[in-house]
Regions:
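Active-site lining segments of carbohydrate-active enzymes
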Residues: 9, 15-22, 79, 85-143, ...
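The feature captures the catalytic groove of carbohydrate-active enzymes
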Residues: 51-66, 115-165, 180-238
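Conserved catalytic neighborhood of penicillin-recognizing serine enzymes
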Residues: 63-83, 87, 212, 219
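Hydrophobic core segments within long, regular secondary-structure runs in both alpha-
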Residues: 29-36, 74, 90-101, 105, ...
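Acidic/polar, glycine-enriched structural segments that form the non-catalytic walls/loops
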Residues: 1-68, 87-107, 235
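Sec-exported extracytoplasmic/periplasmic mature domains
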Residues: 36-43, 82, 98, 102, ...
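Alpha-helix C-terminal capping/termination sites
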Residues: 21, 28, 40-41, 77, ...
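Soluble non-cytosolic domains of exported or imported proteins
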Residues: 22-29, 71, 162, 218, ...
Length: 238
């Protein structure tokens, strides 16, 4: 495998035709199946969801606490769950969202004086939803619960499990309710979030200063649009 990876990267051609060595569809297939194996072995009903470093990592104190980083990492872990016919491996994520909800409701009340529930860019086994760390490109971002909740309707779309959707409907509505109270109208008459960030991105101002906080990042609007769409469609189905 090491030799195949080296050839794929173009590091070692062994004097042979480069194109023939780089094209290794079987290695791509192997990596795809390895990803399925990691999900099957690491995310079973009744267990915890896939975390940041994986349950098989070698460190006693893994990087970033091996928590659930929900500004893309946790979601990305589950992007293939339904399309790869591993719906049952998706279930631990919904258990985590259930644990997050009461904490997220308290965070919404205490921090924003809003109803519903909210989570920022990290959570853990106990479903902590408050902002974590002090790194501006990530910390002040209230979209974690909303993005995770998009997985609820995706699971329904693949399984057509109405009982599951009915059980999760209040959670979907709670994530959406927060934004009906949190968003505000900008000078152009648009409903926007803010302050928020484009997760782990920065920008340069006209004066050349580096910034991270902004009003109405596109990612927030996209997640909220999908979340509201899911709530409306779920209500129609139920």
């Amino acid at each position: 495998t090491d030799a195949r990876l080296s050839r794929l990267r173009g590091n070692d051609f062994d004097g042979k035709d480069a194109a023939g060595l780089i094209l290794d569809n079987k290695l791509t297939e192997l990596y795809f199946n390895y990803g399925r194996y990691l999900m099957i072995s690491g995310s079973r009903p009744g267990s915890q969801p896939l975390n940041l470093q994986g349950i098989w990592n070698q460190d006693m104190w893994p990087a970033w606490g091996s928590r659930f980083t929900v500004n893309i990492n946790t979601e990305m872990n589950y992007w293939c769950a339904e399309s790869c016919n591993l719906s049952e491996c998706h279930l631990p994520l919904f258990d985590l969202i259930r644990r997050m909800r009461p904490n997220g409701e308290q965070t919404a009340r205490d921090m924003y004086h809003c109803g519903g529930f909210v989570c920022h860019h990290n959570t853990d086994l106990w479903g902590d939803c408050a902002p974590q760390d002090r790194w501006m490109p990530a910390t002040i971002w209230p979209m974690g619960a909303a993005w995770l909740c998009l997985h609820i309707f995706e699971h329904y779309q693949y399984t057509l499990d109405r009982d599951f959707l009915a059980q999760q409907f209040d959670t979907l509505c709670g994530a959406a309710q927060f934004f009906t109270e949190y968003m505000f109208e900008n000078s152009a008459g648009q409903l926007v979030t803010g302050p928020s960030v484009s997760p782990e991105n920065t920008y340069l101002t006209e004066s050349g200063a580096k910034g991270s906080l902004c009003i109405g990042p596109s990612m927030d609007s996209q997640i909220i649009t999908l979340l509201f769409t899911d709530v409306l469609e779920a209500a129609r189905i139920l």
